[in-house]
Amino acid sequence: MRRRYASTILFPCAPYLSFFRSLGAPATVNVEVLQDKLDHPWALAFLPDNHGMLITLRGGELRHWQAGKGLSAPLSGVPDVWAHGQGGLLDVVLAPDFAQSRRIWLSYSEVGDDGKAGTAVGYGRLSDDLSKVTDFRTVFRQMPKLSTGNHFGGRLVFDGKGYLFIALGENNQRPTAQDLDKLQGKLVRLTDQGEIPDDNPFIKESGVRAEIWSYGIRNPQGMAMNPWSNALWLNEHGPRGGDEINIPQKGKNYGWPLATWGINYSGFKIPEAKGEIVAGTEQPVFYWKDSPAVSGMAFYNSDKFPQWQQKLFIGALKDKDVIVMSVNGDKVTEDGRILTDRGQRIRDVRTGPDGYLYVLTDESSGELLKVSPRN
């Protein structure tokens, strides 16, 4: 059954963020629960022609949800996943030519012969009746597999030219983010067929993985194309502090673990860290001194609600809310938070084709929420 709520935006006092900007009086949002009892949902992807959306559940299920029809049974044909720790079935995106090919892409964690796991990506065809995925083919595997359950990353985004970007965590093995012969802690760029593009930055260098677009990444959790600049934006978890937003550029080093604004969970310095600003590494466009545990992110690119124009919404797992940010070119400022009173980990945030904001909560009985501003 659908439920409706009003939720208050909380405007934090954060003296360490000199670029914080208050919006003034608190506002509220309308919240409609479209679906509950979702077992740790991870991502959603909208289908065209008002056919609802696909939702991944971390345990390994792909479901279809549509207004008036509700939640489907699990779709068949999904690859086996390693659902341990932070691993499982992760992101889902439609291919740019979905209208013709019916192709969907999935990221997931898979285990190797030694019991350690890594991120894998593949595609298959979504059946016309939305009940199954056929001819699934894995085209990318993170190698070597080093994870015992942490830092898989897994976000997928197609850019405007049809290239697929895959955000990969460092499997909780810090030094690998700087090793160009490994795929841990990297942003990977492939063609829409899963092949390596000829213009990738390291394609002609020996001993370097040609899939790599940029590196020095810890644990990426959100990624989206900026609709106003057509640039790819990426967020990632820091350790204790130091969550970041970056605009990853070709061949650039984003620092981890050499440069970080965070410290170890123990309270001590990261052993490999040389400071916050390190020569040869890129600075984030925004960082949090206290980590909210950022997750899925969405630019608001609809005319439905003018007050949300030029906004970026980012889920927060630890803070259990959605961060509202204003975007001005390559700069962002935090305006406030919404969904602060629900007490749920926010896993994914998307702008729907109808102009509403859609949110997944990462709980054993997670929810699909439809959110709009309340005037």
Descriptions of predicted regions:
Residues 75-87, 136-149, 192-213, 258-289:
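Surface-exposed loop and turn segments in beta-propeller and other repeat-based domains
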Residues 23-174, 222-225, 230-238, 290-328, ...:
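Acidic, Gly/Ser/Thr-rich repeat motifs that build Ca2+-stabilized beta-propeller blades
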Residues 166-184, 242-244, 248:
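Short, conserved, GDST-rich strand-edge loop motifs in beta-rich repeat architectures
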Residues 1-7:
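N-terminal export leaders
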Residues 120-129, 180-192, 248:
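Beta-propeller blade signature
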Residues 208-249:
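Repeat-solenoid scaffold signature
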Residues 333-353:
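Conserved blade-ending motifs and adjacent loop-strand segments that build the rim/top face
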Residues 25-30, 69-73, 126-137, 194-209, ...:
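Beta-strand initiation motifs
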